[in-house]
């Protein structure tokens, strides 16, 4: 992010689409009571501010992922961007109001009043910390949820 701030207005800056999409997986082993509840997982999806993450990580140069396929990587049979076509059916829009409602329902179903989650990222990446900070900030708006961050090298957290 610091280098982007420094060079963002430079006419020499060239921006290329990346062929990667970063995503999260929820540990559903049962070790964290609550993550097996579909309403809680959906609430976390709705409470994930993808645009906020993209902005904090790239100073607005990246776009928020709307699916597993990166924008500009593949075309549909009609020549359109496959990522845009697929997003219509799969994307979660940031909706903290709906997230709070679903989270409360899920917590009640799971018999929980409080829950602590740990989000992990790699210390090998220059963007992991700002990504985790944004996730922590938005998820902790859900009543009863505490979010901890864990950074480690890929062999520890990947």
Pin down the residues of each PLM region.
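Ligand/substrate-recognition segments at binding pockets and active sites
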Residues: 1, 104-158
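Extracellular/periplasmic solute-recognition and catalytic clefts
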Residues: 1-31, 56
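Extracytoplasmic/secreted envelope proteins and their assembly/folding machinery
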Residues: 4, 23, 37, 41, ...
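Sec-exported extracytoplasmic/periplasmic mature domains
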Residues: 8-9, 31, 40, 45-62, ...
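Active-site-proximal beta-strand/loop segments in catalytic clefts of secreted hydrolases
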Residues: 18, 27-29, 56-58, 69-72, ...
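Extracytoplasmic
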Residues: 19-21, 64, 114
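Second-shell loop/turn segments in exported
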Residues: 27-34, 40-43, 83-92, 121-125
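Structural transition elements
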Residues: 64-105, 124-129
């Amino acid at each position: 992010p610091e280098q982007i701030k420094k060079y963002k207005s430079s006419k020499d800056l060239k921006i290329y689409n990346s062929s990667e999409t970063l995503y999260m997986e929820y540990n559903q082993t049962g070790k964290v009571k609550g993550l097996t509840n579909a309403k809680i997982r959906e609430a976390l999806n709705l409470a994930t501010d993808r645009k906020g993450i993209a902005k904090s990580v790239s100073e607005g140069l990246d776009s928020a992922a709307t699916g597993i396929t990166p924008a500009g990587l593949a075309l549909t049979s009609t020549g359109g961007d496959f990522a845009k076509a697929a997003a219509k059916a799969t994307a979660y829009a940031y909706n903290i109001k709906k997230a709070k409602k679903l989270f409360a329902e899920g917590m009640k179903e799971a018999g929980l009043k409080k829950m602590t989650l740990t989000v992990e990222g790699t210390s090998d990446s220059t963007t992991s910390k700002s990504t985790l900070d944004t996730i922590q900030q938005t998820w902790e708006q859900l009543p009863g949820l505490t979010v901890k961050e864990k950074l480690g090298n890929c062999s520890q957290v990947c």
